[in-house]
Amino acid sequence: MGRDSSFWLSPVFLLPVTPPGNFSSKDSNIPQILTNFAETSNLAFMINFECDYTEGAHASILQRLAETNMEQTPGYGKDRHCENARQIIRRVCNAPDADVHFLVGGTQTNKTVIASILRPYQGVICVETGHIAVHETGAIESTGHKVITVPGINGKITPQLIEQVYRRHFDDKGLEHCVQPGMVYISQSTEVGTVYHLNELEAISAMCRKLELPLFLDGARLGYGLAASDNDTSLADIARLCDVFYIGGTKIGALFGEAVVINNPSITPGFRYMIKQNGGLLAKGRLLGIQFETLFENDLYMQLSRHAVEQAMRIRCALEAKGVALAYASTTNQQFPILPDSVIEHLSDRYIFSTTEHLTPGMTEVRICTSWATLSENVDRLIDDLDKAL
């Protein structure tokens, strides 16, 4: 298979074929049975901008996993690959004393970290659009902890909002009848594609330390945040300002995996117990270590992140040039244009994206999401079709 080959899932089988954007029924590497199926069923190969985890993994990761496949290593993250990845992450974060753990997915990681920090009567403060509040099926609440939401500003929380929640609770004479704020959760980049700037993170961190509330940063899309044109933070800044955060792999080139970085030593005791209790202690833990070793070799993590952001910003610029309003000032890989329903219908026979909110009659906010693997040719096609439809 060539470098640009991928797997296309048909309703009946999984076969290696040319990517959808380059599909040709005459291509010699497409089995005739698939060609016949496409012709008889009018199967359309869609270009997917729905999310940033539709593809598998970067070829370097797959190659490294194959090369190490027959190695015999200890389980549960105690192998040499995980240890090497820990050392690499400590170095790039300028956090030599950080405790680093590898988990499989974002919801599992959020649930494990939050449950490790909070007492049974405490909750976690986050904005209304926070992932733990709206897209985790009550995972945090299932542990007995309330998610205390506040209205964010462009998807972001502020020190003032944090202090308001804290004061409202502790100034109440009947405070023991209510859930006590116990920590703060933020995302970088946010769920709406915006980023926290260094002065914002410093102010939030200072407020959290003043109120003795641990600060947890969800980094599922951290690479995309670091690659944003207006970003002025580094991994070292985040490690310095947050009690705990994680570096997302699932959405940025890995098959799966999130690297939790704990900088507050009070969180460390018992954390592996919590990982195990939440089903996150992977027996073949080396699969996680190898992926993060590879992502942080030769700046691959940031190369992949920059590619996704560059493609998203091409789309944003094209939309702005046509006078399309965008719901958020996103500088990352997620863009939220407000489009006429007629345009959405016109595009829907070729493109997949998410509908986020129906606004005024005939107008809908959608999410267009690029990834580390988005083909520039597919962005060209989308821009061309948008130009024709608008």
Q: Can you name each region flagged by the protein language model?
A:
Residues 119-121, 313-388:
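Conserved C-terminal alpha-helix-loop-beta "cap" of PLP-dependent enzymes
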